[in-house]
């Protein structure tokens, strides 16, 4: 049965939008005639164009500007949205289908009385007003907005200089020059989402660095990307970005095409490549002329390039603008004073990108300290989440303690078990694996600032770790990705990181894959494993989200050797090992009157430390391999540790060499030559005392000390297996130090001895430069006593004699 609306009902609906959305209208919707005046208003989620009556109300109230009605609607909307979850308005969310009144509740309209209903009387079922609309082309230089009525939206419309209301269509239209202004203002209305104008979907309204000065010109460029395919074309080509200022047209010979090229003011022909290049400011005219040729098909530059280099299409500049100096006065001086110039530049870049970037500096350039400084810049938005490989969780905690002394140590929360809280600290540090396990226990509110260490762990969007991380990253306001090995040769592995930082850049993976992964359609599906247009991709990433400096570029600012203390944990060791380690520590604490017994007890403690560290050592080596470190050295002392490392590498089919006390002298040189010549992943597993001299392994630039040794001279000799004549890179030295083990006492002693050597000129570098990042050495009397035992029990000759005997 169907009943038409009475004239009285129509009049009342036109007078007041809230009456049209009254509950009485909802109840009548089941039997009402399915006309636009009812169905499109009463049924939330109905697809189609905007309701005519809503547009009519917009015209009446927009033109009359009756304050009482507008005030009533705004007050009710505010009351409704108080309990509503925040709505993120992004290109991804607005790319969904257009709904005239989708999700629009009819709250607050139980009856038609004139005063507004108090918030307490608003039904709880539909607490948020949510309105979807779209921008569509209206004429050559204008666009219109198809959307239902919302009082706040009408106020925005009225503020646009080129506003025009069309009574015939009951819609508002605007000049393309004001498109940017309108979308920016609508982005601040949490209950409204407008689908972008066709061709402008990729435009990131919120990113100040990517705003075009002339939205109309940008819209025209975007339209060049539409409908460029010509089925009957006999000549096909494409435009490719070759520098920040120039594009290349890769196309076969055709007289008309060459004629167009020669007319371009910035034309340049390369005799070697036989390609034409042009300034970006000529792109619009170039494409417009080429599109006029019926037999020529030219693939345009992708939306992402137009968006990221928008200012270049207006007036081309060869040099990128230098980011302004960020104000770091509110950050701990201990941190800001320690930044090298290029690291300060990295912080400036991050701030200019509003805290969303991929920091892809080479290993050893201080990505950690830069990330901490960037996060500290946005400290008012904390709590902070740090996601890192399991082996470096505690290294991050120590780094925060060192660089941000204003942060209380007990406010740093390192998640070690799945049952631990993810939000109990101001700084929360978790591993990728644990984040995946806690995926089903999301935090009560999203993290606004997130650091993802070794973000290339997210390279496969199908993995559990990626599925757990991406939702957090999409809701975060600041996203700091760290990776020393961006997969530029495998662009498909970069896509998830691009999505995390700038999701609007490439909303669809297939578009990214066809442009940069040389996508091919095979019988079983699409293959995205290759690469294409890599120069353009590199330029695009550097312009929009990525900062990458190589060691060779900042060599003058770096020390020849950079030492890093990596704090590892003994969590996960079996109860027997743990009990033995604790027992050895207790025995040492008692003290000995007999020097021989003291030495023996110290060696027992050292041996149990090796057993307790094995798991953490293997985890760290695995992380280094996954991070892309193809060649490095691992020094250890105990046979148990050396055996465990080589066994693990063998099981993973990783090439390695091993040199220890049992390796014949004749074989050592052959093993070194094999390592030096290797072009694939290869790890040199070496004994600290048996392979610390006489070997040249400078094809690697990373040394990992899985165990400590209390003679710093031996450690320096081991470091110099790679830091020697022929080394063309800076050398990274990583010391793995475990709390609650003999390392607590060995490391302070090593520092003290090295300081003495430096003061007398016997060492050119201080091994304790980075030691502050590992504050293991407490000042309780028991620990000092054990340290003194290590110092007095062995002179250098005795140490070497005892330690050369592997247990």
From Swiss-Prot:
Free-text function comment from the UniProt entry: ATP-dependent annealing helicase that catalyzes the rewinding of the stably unwound DNA. Rewinds single-stranded DNA bubbles that are stably bound by replication protein A (RPA). Acts throughout the genome to reanneal stably unwound DNA, performing the opposite reaction of many enzymes, such as helicases and polymerases, that unwind DNA.
Name by which UniProt lists this protein: SWI/SNF-related matrix-associated actin-dependent regulator of chromatin subfamily A-like protein 1
Residue ranges, annotated region (Disordered): 1-68, 98-124
Gene responsible for this protein: smarcal1
Family membership noted in the UniProt record: Belongs to the SNF2/RAD54 helicase family. SMARCAL1 subfamily.
Motif (DESH box): 453-456
Reaction equations catalysed: ATP + H2O = ADP + phosphate + H(+)
GO terms for MF: ATP binding; ATP-dependent DNA/DNA annealing activity; helicase activity; hydrolase activity
Domain of life of the organism encoding this protein: Eukaryota
């Amino acid at each position: 049965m169907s009943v038409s609306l009475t004239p009285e009902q129509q009049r009342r609906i036109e007078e007041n939008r809230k009456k049209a959305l009254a509950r009485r209208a909802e109840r009548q919707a089941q039997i009402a005639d399915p006309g636009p005046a009812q169905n499109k208003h009463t049924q939330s989620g109905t697809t189609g164009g905007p309701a005519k009556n809503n547009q009519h109300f917009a015209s009446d109230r927009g033109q009359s500007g009756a304050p009482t009605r507008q005030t009533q609607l705004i007050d009710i909307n505010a009351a409704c949205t108080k309990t509503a979850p925040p709505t993120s308005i992004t290109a991804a969310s607005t790319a969904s289908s257009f709904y005239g009144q989708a999700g629009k509740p009819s709250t607050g309209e139980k009856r038609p009385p004139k005063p507004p209903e108090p918030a307490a009387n608003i039904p709880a079922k539909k607490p948020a007003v949510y309105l979807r609309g779209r921008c569509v082309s209206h004429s050559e230089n204008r666009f219109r907005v198809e959307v239902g009525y919302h009082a706040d939206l009408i106020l925005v419309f009225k503020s646009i200089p080129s506003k025009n209301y069309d009574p015939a269509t009951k819609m508002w239209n605007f000049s393309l020059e004001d498109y940017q202004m309108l979308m920016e203002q609508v982005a601040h209305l949490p209950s409204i989402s407008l689908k972008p104008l066709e061709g402008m979907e990729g435009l990131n309204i919120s990113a100040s660095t990517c705003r075009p000065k002339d939205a109309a010109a940008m819209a025209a460029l975007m339209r060049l990307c539409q409908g460029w395919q010509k089925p009957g074309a006999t000549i096909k080509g494409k435009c490719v970005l070759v520098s920040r200022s120039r594009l290349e047209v890769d196309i076969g010979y055709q007289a008309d095409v060459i004629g167009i090229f020669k007319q371009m003011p910035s034309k340049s022909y390369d005799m070697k490549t036989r390609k034409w290049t042009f300034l970006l400011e000529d792109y619009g005219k170039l494409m417009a002329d080429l599109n006029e040729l019926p037999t020529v098909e030219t693939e345009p530059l992708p939306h992402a390039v137009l968006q990221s280099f928008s200012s270049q299409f207006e007036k081309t500049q060869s040099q990128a603008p230098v980011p302004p100096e960020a104000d770091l006065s509110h950050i701990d001086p201990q941190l800001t004073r320690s930044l090298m110039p290029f690291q300060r530049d990295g912080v400036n870049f991050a701030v200019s990108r509003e805290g969303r970037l991929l920091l892809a500096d080479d290993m050893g350039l201080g990505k950690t300290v830069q990330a901490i400084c960037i996060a500290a810049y946005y400290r008012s938005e904390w709590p902070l989440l740090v996601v890192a490989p399991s082996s470096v969780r505690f290294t991050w905690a120590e780094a925060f303690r060192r660089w941000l002394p204003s942060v209380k140590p007990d406010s740093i929360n390192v998640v070690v078990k799945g049952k631990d809280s993810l939000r109990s600290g101001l700084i929360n540090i978790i591993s990728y694996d644990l984040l995946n396990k806690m995926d089903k226990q999301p935090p009560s509110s999203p993290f606004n600032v997130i650091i993802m260490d070794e973000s290339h762990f997210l390279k496969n969007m199908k993995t559990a770790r990626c599925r757990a991380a991406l939702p957090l990253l999409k809701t975060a306001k600041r996203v700091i990705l760290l990776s020393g090995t961006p997969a530029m040769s495998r662009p498909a592995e970069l896509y998830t990181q691009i999505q995390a930082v700038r999701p609007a850049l490439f909303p669809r993976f297939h578009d990214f894959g066809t442009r940069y992964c040389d996508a091919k359609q095979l019988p079983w599906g699409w293959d995205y494993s290759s690469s294409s247009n890599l120069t353009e991709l590199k330029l695009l990433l550097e312009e929009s989200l990525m900062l990458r400096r190589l060691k060779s570029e900042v060599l003058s600012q770096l020390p020849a050797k950079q030492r890093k203390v990596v704090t590892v944990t003994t969590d996960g060791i079996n109860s027997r090992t743990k009990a033995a380690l604790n027992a050895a520590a207790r025995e040492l604490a008692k003290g000995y009157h007999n020097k021989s017994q003291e030495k023996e007890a110290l060696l027992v403690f050292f041996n149990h430390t090796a057993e307790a560290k094995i798991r953490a050592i293997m985890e760290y080596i695995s992380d280094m391999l996954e991070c892309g470190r193809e060649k490095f050295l691992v020094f250890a002392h105990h046979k148990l540790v050396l055996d465990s490392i080589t066994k693990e590498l063998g099981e993973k089919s990783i090439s390695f060499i091993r040199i220890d006390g049992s390796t014949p002298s004749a074989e050592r040189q052959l093993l070194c030559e094999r390592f030096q010549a290797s072009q694939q992943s290869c790890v040199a597993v070496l004994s600290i005392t048996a392979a610390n001299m006489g070997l040249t392994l400078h094809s690697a630039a990373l040394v990992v000390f899985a165990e400590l040794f209390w003679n710093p001279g031996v450690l320096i000799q081991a470091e110099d297996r790679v830091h020697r004549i022929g080394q063309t890179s800076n050398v990274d030295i990583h010391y793995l130090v475990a709390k609650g083990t003999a390392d607590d006492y060995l490391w302070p002693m090593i520092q003290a001895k090295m300081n003495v050597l430096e003061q007398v000129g016997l060492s050119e570098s201080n091994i304790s430069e980075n030691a502050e990042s590992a504050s293991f050495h407490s000042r309780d009397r028991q620990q000092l006593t054990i340290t003194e035992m290590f110092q007095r029990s062995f002179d250098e000759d005795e140490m070497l004699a005892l330690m050369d005997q592997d247990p």
